[in-house]
């Protein structure tokens, strides 16, 4: 029943975009910000398919979601707790109150950018009387980068052949410019990444169990995302398909995208920025070198490590919030 209802809504959303273009994206973005479950992201990614410009679609979606969020704010302010509880449940009211007390306007930014239910945050912003200007600015800061990133991803998918050529060019640019010093150092940096991540995580856990648990959660989530993507994308290693690769390590036939070493290195480094700024900067520098080493030794493409960086930074940021407490059963 729920699944069928969702598919009906999706079909209606697709009809709106297919027939009304940017107006359809605006309507979807506006309504998703306070009530309906279909996000505009999928239509921004597929904008080219509908004959639309991805960047313009992202901007239209940002305007729509900002105005829709303000409408949700108004509903929360005027209708209050009883209607909110009927629509979303009492659980979200209590968790939302805890979230707002801890993060304030930053909670709006987090919900706008992340998979957290933004519509719930919009209602709660009105219920808890957040300043309208702060709410609006927080929405734009959270939503605009997200939609632009989605638009860029959609543009990349639409130009996959050109992207592949750039990826190979950058791989050779790094891998073919080698010297005996880097040939000695880079394999060591690459091979010791996992042991260093494990040892550092253990030390952090012993010194600060609460943060250590968050770090382990972030690393586990990053690993699962990277592992799943590897076998979903199933991109072969560069040394299996390209000629004249300067190969210093061998990862067998394991898929290439994304780089697991880079993913976990950036998860650790980003997490440590919230634990100790100096330590975080030190490990961030190390993570960048790890990413470079994976291309240098011939086992990854530049896009593999770029994807690993993005996943790692995202998962590392989760140590900043008690996300596993706040989005139970979402």
Swiss-Prot record:
Q: Which InterPro entries match?
A: DedA_domain, P_Acid_Pase_2/haloperoxi_sf, P_Acid_Pase_2/haloperoxidase, VTT_dom
Listed SUPFAM superfamilies: Acid phosphatase/Vanadium-dependent haloperoxidase
Q: Which Pfam families does the record associate with it?
A: PAP2, VTT_dom
What top-level branch of life does the organism fall under?
Archaea
Which Gene Ontology molecular function entries are recorded, alphabetically? sphingosine-1-phosphate phosphatase activity
Show the PANTHER family listed in the entry. Answer: ALKALINE PHOSPHATASE LIKE PROTEIN, DEDA FAMILY PROTEIN
Q: What is this protein called?
A: Uncharacterized protein MJ0374
């Amino acid at each position: 029943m729920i699944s069928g209802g969702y598919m009906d809504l999706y079909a209606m959303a697709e009809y709106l975009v297919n027939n009304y273009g940017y107006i359809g994206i605006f309507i979807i973005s506006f309504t998703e910000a306070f009530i309906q479950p279909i996000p505009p992201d999928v239509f921004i990614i597929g904008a080219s398919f509908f004959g639309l410009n991805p960047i313009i679609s992202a901007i239209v979606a940002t305007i729509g979601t900002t105005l829709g969020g303000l409408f949700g704010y108004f509903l929360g302010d005027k209708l209050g707790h009883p209607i909110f509880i009927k629509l979303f449940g009492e659980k979200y009211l209590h968790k939302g109150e805890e979230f707002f007390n801890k993060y304030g306007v930053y909670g709006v930014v987090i919900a706008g950018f992340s998979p957290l239910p933004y519509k719930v945050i919009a209602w709660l912003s009105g219920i808890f009387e957040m300043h309208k200007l702060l709410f609006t600015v927080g929405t734009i800061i959270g939503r605009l980068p997200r939609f632009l990133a989605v638009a860029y991803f959609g543009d990349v998918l639409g130009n996959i052949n050109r992207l592949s050529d750039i990826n190979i060019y950058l791989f050779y640019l790094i891998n073919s410019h080698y010297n005996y010093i880097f040939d000695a150092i880079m394999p060591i940096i690459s091979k010791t990444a996992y042991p260093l991540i494990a040892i550092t995580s253990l030390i952090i856990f012993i010194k600060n169990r609460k943060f250590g648990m968050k770090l382990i959660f972030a690393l586990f989530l990053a690993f699962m995302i990277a592992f799943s993507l590897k076998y979903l994308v199933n991109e072969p290693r560069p040394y299996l398909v390209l000629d004249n690769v300067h190969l210093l390590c061998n990862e067998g036939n394991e898929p290439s995208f994304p780089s697991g070493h880079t993913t976990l290195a950036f998860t650790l480094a980003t997490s440590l920025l919230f634990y100790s700024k100096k330590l975080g900067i030190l490990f961030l520098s190390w993570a960048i070198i790890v990413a470079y080493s994976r291309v240098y030794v011939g086992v990854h493409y530049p896009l593999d490590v770029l994807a690993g960086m993005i996943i790692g930074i995202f998962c590392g940021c989760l140590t900043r919030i008690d996300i596993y407490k706040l989005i139970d059963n979402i």
